[in-house]
Structure formats: structure tokens, C-alpha cells
Amino acid sequence: MIQQETRLNVADNSGAKEAQCIRVLGSSGRRYAGIGDQIVVSVKSAIPSGEINKGDVSRAVVVRTAKETRREDGTYIRFDENAAVLINQEEEPVGTRVFGPVAREVREKQFMRIVSLAPEVL
């Protein structure tokens, strides 16, 4: 569960290391984002030579959450951290690599490029 002011690790090589959620995209009163949902983030820390700089505002897709997510078959999945992958306006990832596993829910939300770059899909 990601809401406004939540800090997330950035799980790609775009240059950003940490980002803060500033808006959950969806219906007007939506408060929480889960795995596979789009959010708007502000980059809080970045590497000096990266494509993304500190202070940049970007869209992102949540790929891991510390709060467990229930699946249709009754199982739950949770991760040790909250993480997101930065995307552009065409919903393509900004980076060329994705670090760490991503949840199967990302595939169900049609972010195939992120799934193909991920080393593992759980």
C-alpha cells in the first residue's frame, strides 16, 4: 500500500535511487496504490551521472510492496521493501534494466516491457 509521502526505492538504472510518492493515479479520491498501479513521484536521491536528477517529477509503476497483496487463489505475496520503476508518458520504462524481482500483477496490468526486463517474476 503506497500513499502520498511514501518513499520508495527505484528498481531500475535510470539514475534515481529513491523517490517519494506525490500522487496516486486513478480515480479522484484514490488513496492507496498497490502492485502494478501508476503513481507520480518526486526523485529524492539520484546518482550524479544519471538520466534522472534529484527533484525531477516522473511517473512510476509500483513493482514491490512491503504490505502483503492477496491473489485470486488465496495466496499472499509481500516483499521486504517498497519499490517502483520509472516510466515515461508512453508507459515505457526510462531505464534499460530492472533490479530485483517483480510481482506477477505487473504483467496483468500490461506492463510487458518491465516484466521482460525483470530478472524474476514472482
Swiss-Prot record:
GO terms for cellular component: cytosolic large ribosomal subunit. Gene3D superfamilies: Ribosomal protein L14. Transmembrane segments: none annotated. InterPro entries: Ribosomal_uL14, Ribosomal_uL14_bac-type, Ribosomal_uL14_CS, Ribosomal_uL14_sf. Keywords: Ribonucleoprotein, Ribosomal protein, RNA-binding, rRNA-binding. Binds to 23S rRNA. Forms part of two intersubunit bridges in the 70S ribosome. Part of the 50S ribosomal subunit. Forms a cluster with proteins L3 and L19. In the 70S ribosome, L14 and L19 interact and together make contacts with the 16S rRNA in bridges B5 and B8. This is Large ribosomal subunit protein uL14. The lineage of its organism: Bacteria, Pseudomonadati, Rhodothermota, Rhodothermia, Rhodothermales. The gene is rplN.
